[in-house]
Amino acid sequence: MPKQEHPQHQKPHHVQVQPEQKAAPMIKNYLTIDELTEILDELEVEYEVELDDSEENKDPFITCVMSEEPFNIVPLGQGPFYEEFLLRTVLPADFDPYEMCNQFNRTYNYCSAFTSTIHTDSTEDEEQTIVAIERAVMLCGGVTRDHIISTFQMWETILLHASSFFNGTLDESA
């Protein structure tokens, strides 16, 4: 009985196996509130979306807490597709707020600190000077989701430093 030969299945030598390629990161020129909150969920940030109920402004804003530090995200531009947003926190200053803002702005180039006056009671007789810290995040040139996540992670570090700095607990020599 003649032997049957079984051809072996081998890949031809001229075929190259291509490594798996990742999809190119999606470039975003705008974000919706849903996309922002999806990123906040991923970063496990506590937040609440609120609407400004004033007559001239119906834009949403997001109140957040990250590492026990409160801040706001204020979308800017024509909604629902926002081309930029503002990260903002407000802190009391234990020392001279004007001098502290100058020192902070010389040290941290990532954001800006400035003073503001608020009224502390209903009669508007008592005023308190507070410090606001802001960072504008523009998307108009196109950014990736990873860039936005990194921006929030850097903002968290700034929040912690700012809180310590303006409350006199940060050792700048360390």
Please provide the spans of the model-predicted regions.
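Charge-rich, low-complexity N-terminal segments
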Residues: 1-74, 115
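Hydrophobic residues embedded in beta-strands of well-ordered beta-sheets
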Residues: 60-62, 80, 129-131
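Charged/polar positions within long, soluble alpha-helices
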Residues: 113, 160, 164-167
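Well-ordered alpha/beta subsegment
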Residues: 119-153, 164-174
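Long, contiguous binding/interaction regions
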Residues: 157
